From Swiss-Prot:
Transmembrane annotation, as ranges: 3-23, 65-85, 136-156, 179-199, 263-283, 293-313, 399-419, 436-456, 504-524, 546-566
Similarity-based family: Belongs to the KdpA family.
Assigned GO CC terms: plasma membrane
Disulfide bonds: none
The protein's name in its UniProt record: Potassium-transporting ATPase potassium-binding subunit
Major localization listed first in the record, in broad terms: membrane
Name of the encoding gene: kdpA
Upper classification of the organism: Bacteria, Pseudomonadati, Myxococcota, Polyangia, Polyangiales
Keywords on record: Cell inner membrane, Cell membrane, Ion transport, Membrane, Potassium, Potassium transport, Transmembrane, Transmembrane helix, Transport
GO molecular function: P-type potassium transmembrane transporter activity; potassium ion binding
Source taxon at top rank: Bacteria
Topology in the lipid bilayer: Multi-pass membrane protein
InterPro entries: KdpA
């Protein structure tokens, strides 16, 4: 690893952790209803939203009512987004005359953005109108992120309350997440991105003359190029901050009008993990012990750092096939070195690998390089990060409530080892809690493995595989890992825009999102009804380095046992073939 390669990740993590503390404290105050400067400014808008929706902010919900509100609201959003896509040909703000999106692709896209996955089987600048991008995708970027944050807050209330029947109001949590957190941060980031050259406007696509004419596939001369435009900066800000990831343009943040400079690249990378990291501090403050938040953040950071080093090292080592031909792949003052296939020369190896690790540690899925072109072991890192359940930082809200399920499992395992009923923050962890935590871990994993098996054994799935052998299998495995874990990134060599993949991955995204949310809320309701148990001599401290190690081991062990056989058939075999 070069000096630059070591400095960039270190600077990134330092800034990330430094900003996460004040932001986490601020978010805790928002969810606890503490009034501050933002409340005095945005309070009237919050109250207006409640009146317009007919919501009583002081009326809390049982966990079943909370879950019903989540499902109903998200279903309504999915249907509206589907309708927008099907009708965009006759709706305004469509200067390029985009036609209606086909039914299977419209379903896939609606399921994708409603579930905070942002899997894209289309090219944004060639498929969707400005209205669909803004009123459809942009709105879902906000509310899907706010949904995950709301579910997390409900779980935290379940942990902290005693003998209570309610876990809060979904509508209040949704509005506060959007109004006080996501909107201000998105506005700030959008302005910064515009200052760096990210486009923002409603004009049609622009034409520019080429310096040198070229010929197309038919032999005709091409003398000008079309430059796509649109309201990109506003959507890019929330797609990064909300761990959504769906790009305004087809190549996402590798596009020079979506990510033009080194500063915009750093800001967009920082935005991916900012809220997930800060929510760890929010958790610590809301449970009354900040050490708990630091412990969870330490486990996340440890896994992230190790896998980041593995990804950078694998990409910097280059391609053995090119080395055999005498190609110079060493880093120097004139080149980044390593495996530069599928990467922007302006970003190089380290920034590309850092983004890939961050975007799959979180359920973001945006890219500034093509993951399909990574080396087998370099591509294994983002693949396995998703398969761990998107709990290494993870999505906004969803990452932390997923990690807390692993905390429950780790506490239970520790209790078994000492023969004592496990406890977490004064609440006994019993059979029901273990069942719910197990469902959260099992549903995405089963969806990934079953979906991959169906795809590689049926004609509809096989038609989309253009690369034979282990890499083709890796592409299918990556697609279902991305969909079921609500990430949205892809190995781009898979022909995913087909009725089979649009339907199968669409279903996988819905299962991976909502079959997880319901057990999490059920666990929250169960914990809220329990009494607090005083800590005793046999209580396992959950803020120590020992517990951080136990939690890290639990996450890695579950991920290894579940997916190592599948990984052995894909990237591991491909690596062995490449190096023999």
């Amino acid at each position: 690893m070069t000096a630059s390669g070591a400095l960039q990740p270190a600077l990134y993590l330092a800034v990330l952790i430094g900003l996460s503390v004040p932001l986490g404290t601020y978010m805790a105050r928002v969810y606890q209803g503490e009034r501050g400067l933002m409340a005095s400014v945005l309070g009237p808008l919050e109250r207006l939203a409640y009146r317009a929706a007919g919501v009583r902010p002081d009326q809390e919900m049982r966990w079943k009512d909370y879950a019903f509100a989540v499902l109903a609201f998200n279903l309504a959003g999915l249907l509206v987004l589907y309708a927008l896509q099907r009708l965009q040909g006759v709706l305004p703000l469509n200067p390029e005359g985009m036609a209606a999106v086909p039914p299977d692709l419209a379903f896939n896209t609606a399921a994708s953005f409603a579930s905070n996955t942002n899997w894209q089987a289309y090219g944004g600048e060639s498929t969707l109108s400005y209205l669909t991008q803004m009123a459809g995708l942009g709105v879902q970027n906000f509310v899907s992120a706010a949904t995950g944050m709301a579910v997390l807050v409900a779980l935290i209330r379940g942990i902290t309350r005693k003998t209570a029947d309610t876990v809060g109001s979904f509508w209040v949590d949704l509005v506060r997440s959007t109004l006080y957190i996501l909107l201000p941060l998105s506005l700030l980031l959008a302005v910064l991105l515009v200052s760096q050259g990210v486009v923002q406007g409603f004009g049609g696509h622009q034409s520019a003359s080429l310096l040198q004419a070229v010929k197309d596939q038919g032999g005709s001369a091409v003398v000008e190029q079309v430059i796509p435009m649109g309201p990109a900066a506003s959507q890019i800000a929330i797609k990064q901050l909300g761990t959504n990831g769906g790009g305004f343009f087809n190549v996402n943040s590798a596009h020079p009008l979506e990510n033009p400079t080194a500063l915009s690249n750093f800001l967009e990378m920082l935005a991916i993990l900012l809220i997930p990291a800060a929510l760890c501090h929010t958790f610590g403050r809301m449970v009354g012990d900040r050490r708990q938040g630091w412990a969870v953040l330490a486990a996340m950071t440890a896994i992230f750092a190790v896998l980041l080093v593995a990804c950078v090292a694998s990409e910097q080592a280059g391609n053995p096939a090119l080395s055999a031909l005498g190609v110079d792949q060493a880093a120097s003052a004139l080149q980044a070195g390593g495996n530069m296939e599928g990467k922007e020369a302006r970003f190089g190896i380290t920034s590309s690998a850092l983004w890939a690790t961050a975007t799959t540690a979180a359920s973001n899925g945006s890219v500034n390089a093509m993951h399909d072109s990574f080396t087998p072991l370099g591509g294994l890192v983002p693949l396995w990060l998703m398969q761990l359940g998107e709990v290494v930082f993870g999505g906004v809200g969803s990452g932390l409530y997923g990690m807390l399920m692993f905390v429950v499992i780790a506490v239970f395992v520790a209790g078994l080892m000492v023969g004592r009923t496990p406890e977490y923050l004064g609440k006994k962890i019993e059979a029901f809690e273990m069942k719910m935590a197990s469902l959260v871990v099992l549903f995405p994993a089963i969806t990934v493995l079953v979906g991959t098996a169906i795809a590689v054994t049926t004609e509809g799935g096989q038609k989309g595989v253009f690369n034979p052998g282990p890499h083709g299998f890796s592409e299918v495995l990556y697609a279902f890992s991305s969909g079921a874990n609500n990430n949205g990134s892809a190995f781009g060599g898979l022909g995913a825009n087909s009725p089979f993949y649009n339907t199968a991955i669409g279903v996988a995204m819905l299962v991976g999102r909502y079959a997880v949310i319901v057990p999490v809320l059920a666990l929250a309701g169960s914990l809220a009804r329990k009494k607090l148990v005083p800590a005793g001599p046999g209580t396992l401290p959950t803020h120590t380095p020992l517990f951080v190690g136990l939690l890290t081991g639990t996450v890695l062990l579950v991920g290894a046992l579940t997916f190592v056989p599948a990984l052995a058939l894909g990237p591991v075999v491909e690596h062995l073939e490449m190096t023999r």
